[in-house]
């Protein structure tokens, strides 16, 4: 009886989740993204061919931790992380833009997203903290540009001397992720105002990929409402402001 009850509960929850997706539009978004990926495939091997294999091997030998899948050494597994960033680029429609975009990637990590973007004809700048040094060495190996900077609440970003068509931030941690001082709408308002006024060109876009907090949520109800009222399309972890620059 217990096994039957648990099985029934699991099925019921999946049905409820599917209905919720239909109601809030995420099912349509998922289907649209899947269709776009099918129409615009990207072969990760084509990107890997452009990487200096000997140089990458040296970095791997220097920083790798066998079996590590949680902390930063995991990003040395290009075969695992390139497909994820290809998917991100496809969902942002970087495969079907009318012209090359200039991209600012915040919390740029190992640089795989900008590497994929360059493969598609775009260019950009990464911004991240100095640690771990592996990130800087990978950026140099990939021939990508990076600014070292720590993002903090109520502090403007450094002047980069240019404006961008798109600002991205994936798996965000700079919002005091999993800390007691997690950003509220006030901190986000300062941050977004700074991006829009100083970094976005006309018709620019901002894409935020939120990290789940301790309770599994990506944002409080108040923060979600703030994003929506500011004009974002919100799809679970994804918060996309379109045509907000200028």
What residues fall within each predicted segment?
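A short glycine-rich, Lys/Arg-flanked "PGG" loop and its adjoining helix->strand segment in the class I
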Residues: 182-202
